[in-house]
Amino acid sequence: MQETRTVPAGPGLDVGNLTQFEYLALNSPLNIADAHARQELTAGQARIIDDLPNLFLKAAELPVEEVEREAHRAYFGLLGQHSYPGDDGRVLACYSSSVAMEILARSLAGAMSSVALIHPTFDNIPDILRGVGLDLVPVAEERLGEDDLDDVLGSVGCVFVTTPNNPTGRVLSEEGLSRLAGQCAERDLVLALDTSFRGFDPAGHYDHYRVLRDSGCRWVVIEDTGKLWPTLDLKVGWLVTAADLGLPVAKIYSDILLGVSPMVLALVQRFSEDAADGGLADLHRFVAENRAVVREGLAGVPGIHFPDPHSRASVERVHVGARSALEVWSGLRDHNVYVLPCQKFHWANPPEGNSTLRIALARSAAPLREATRALRSVLLAR
């Protein structure tokens, strides 16, 4: 029997983690909670799905290594990551970025006791790191790339950065990454990046792997195809490592899985090629239009503002003023509308998120408009 999950919304009660909130939304047509891509297929993507029988046959006939190599070549090339180490077994395919994160966390736990982690960020990252016994030191995202991180870097073995960040959309610039990687190299720290939202923001399409390689630091990057395309969660999370990482990533990977489905890899290749042929630019326009739907739909509501005016990510934060985000969430649930309250993103200080909601933008226009109207109504009633 499937477990029933509830998330109480009363003040002072345990509200669970963000994935539990997202789970509650899965069966609602007005789910704007999770950041998975749930919009309609484009015409080009629909043709790929129509060709699934041929994709299956191709995946069955070709060597797995060839299918995997073509998939990550198409995906990494699409996003400007031309220096990724694709030819020497350092790109490990996982079922999801969370599986990649679990493998990385277990690898780190045997080599260090503490990790500096960007703040805020999605709470499954700190949950997984803490779950293997690591202590966490929060680093405000605006400090990353600065020269004065000595107070943090002297006490940790790894620095973990989400870029673009979830939920803020902030991108660590090429200059900032180079500076941070240099500091990690000087102290022999591991620099770990989660780039799951990279595809949405051209500012994140500079060649991270070139910067990391040239810095001389030990590094790990988690990539994720699951946020970009509405493939019903058929996706790949890649775990990419430096040659001199010095952590048992490959061994722990082999403890957990053999690989991912070649058919999913073939699907990722085709969707990447479609994106390179104009689909990615179309996606950027689509997300921008949906962001405008939310901002215009909430215009004039007293007390609200949008904390991330320059975000290109497929999520949008809404600050609800003096209102409680949990109370707004509860009111929306009465309309069968689901968003994410942001307390748990602020994993080191949850009250910082008490008045903020996160809205997913990778949705078809009609349900997003309906959900935004309901949000406006609930906000005006409070």
Language-model-derived ranges and their functions:
Residues 195-197, 224-225:
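Short strand-turn motif at the edge of the Rossmann-like AdoMet-binding core
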Residues 2, 85, 334-335, 348-382:
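PLP-dependent enzyme catalytic core of the Aspartate aminotransferase-like
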Residues 285-295, 305-320, 333:
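Conserved glycine-rich beta-strand-loop-beta hairpin in the small C-terminal domain of fold type I
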Residues 58-186, 198-220, 325, 368:
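Conserved core of the PLP fold type I
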Residues 50-51, 213, 217-288:
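Conserved core segment of the aminotransferase class I/II
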